[in-house]
Amino acid sequence: KLKESWDVARIGADAYYKRKSVESFICNFPDQPSSEFCGCSFTPDVTYAENRSDCISLTSQQLINYYVHQMILSEADRDSGEISLFLQPDYKFLFNLLASLNPSDSLKISQIVCVGTETTFTDDHQLTNLKYLHSVFPLYMAGHDYSLYYYYDKIEAHYHSFNLYPCMILTSDAALLCSSDYQTGIFFRSGEVLRMLKNLYISYQEQCTLFFTPAPLTPENHAVVIGSMFDSDFAENDLLGIQPESCLTPFFTGTLLREMFNHDLPNADAILAMAEQAFQMSMDKIKNQQFFIYSTYEGLLQFVRSGRTDEIPEIFYHPLTTEQRIQVLEGVCACCESGAYRFLQKPLNHLPGNLHFCIRGNSGTMIFKNNAGKIFVTSKRQSW
């Protein structure tokens, strides 16, 4: 506590807690489960299904949790379920429930969130916007059809300044409006009310921007995904990345790439040509001192042991042989000597194996595995 107080006084509270928030986001990024996780299937309460009241007042968080629980379970059991959320990602009960679901394949979840225009912190000194981003990632990890929309506003003014029930959860046959602290609310089942709220939600959504859409890196959509990563921002700007293992793809060129590549894939020639061009672009940036990667010794050792990298789905290539691994490590050593590759120190020397993140210009790319082991790529461009 004494050292923390000293650091706050020396650096300044805002700068200190911003850095700690980023550190917390990186160190606690959701990792792929060690064993297969397929979610849970539940059955809605019979009492909830039989209660057909059009309007019910909810006077405690326990009551709200009960109705939210039943709404979500009922919708997840439908053939074409749809859940619409107009609230911040600070309702832990709801987001834990959604992340644990094993719904029908056709369930769609959409959410509208307010992104703060000012730097604000939560009660535990976390950057509000960054904590919200961390809260929604388990839904992507679970493999849900989840779409996140956002708009800019002052969060405090929108949710906490005498606004009557600013939060809404909407399903096919029910709606719940509640306060921002999830303590009181109103539950609706009237068809007329539901149609009005649905139209209102759609009108709001049309005024918002889609935050990002993770795309699976597969042979079928390789062109779109690789193109989003190696775009004009990549070519024109310095690249700064953080990931468990050193970035190895710049060394996958020429004979090595052709030897390790899975030539049995559909469109193999096109995939190989695009990959070689992209990886060569990375090597050119290293030579031009425009490529800086921060990684861990643990991640590099994992590659040494397995001959695999989490940057590329396993379907695209064969594990590297011992000789090929040595060849790649020689390239990594040269990059360490030039300063392009650097190893993280405490407390970031034990990164989650699932985090691969890079920034180039006003764009960012994140690569992660979901609970089923599929690799997804998501890119975000910031407009200033």
What are these regions (language model features)?
Residues 1-5:
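Basic, Lys/Arg-rich alpha-helical nucleic-acid-recognition elements, primarily the DNA-binding modules
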